[in-house]
Amino acid sequence: MHRISLLLRKISTLLLFAYFSAGALTLGVAVYAIARLFIRDIRGRALFIRRCTSKGFRSINAAARLLRVYRVSLEGAVPSASEVRNTVIIANHPTLIDYMILTSLLPENTTCVVSGRLMSGFMRHIISHMLYISNDLPLEDWSSLISPEDAILIFPEGTRSSHHGWRIKFRRGASNLALRLGRDIIPLRIVC
């Protein structure tokens, strides 16, 4: 019975990965091309792409729940666009899908600080159209990329967390960022 369960789990995971890949291809080609052609305002285009990405990730989360690969449960309410306005949202990073889950839940006025390594290759086009910020950029250059309406999502641990405790060792960059930009901090904790 255990072998059958394991096989079903692997098949479900494979189906979810195929669904994710098809969605990424659709977003990466069709949605971004349409947005670039028809939405001239750069910020409006970024918000449209973020909204489409969020909806795509919501559908992946729903498929994952249906296939019993994973499920997302929340404690408390998802903050609204006005509640996250002009804040720095910090979160731990225990899995590869943290960004996907948070993006599906947070409002479209949330921009993300991404690793400079993601700014090379095909991902740089998607990231730049979403007006996400490379952590390689000096803070002085961020002001042209963010609006006071935006929340900034950052994973202060850097790469994925390797511990399961409540105490999380964040780097000081997120608090320094919030202080220098004069923004409040909203902490989020992801538990697997």
PLM regions and their residue ranges:
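Membrane-anchoring hydrophobic helices of lipid-metabolizing enzymes
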Residues: M1-T87
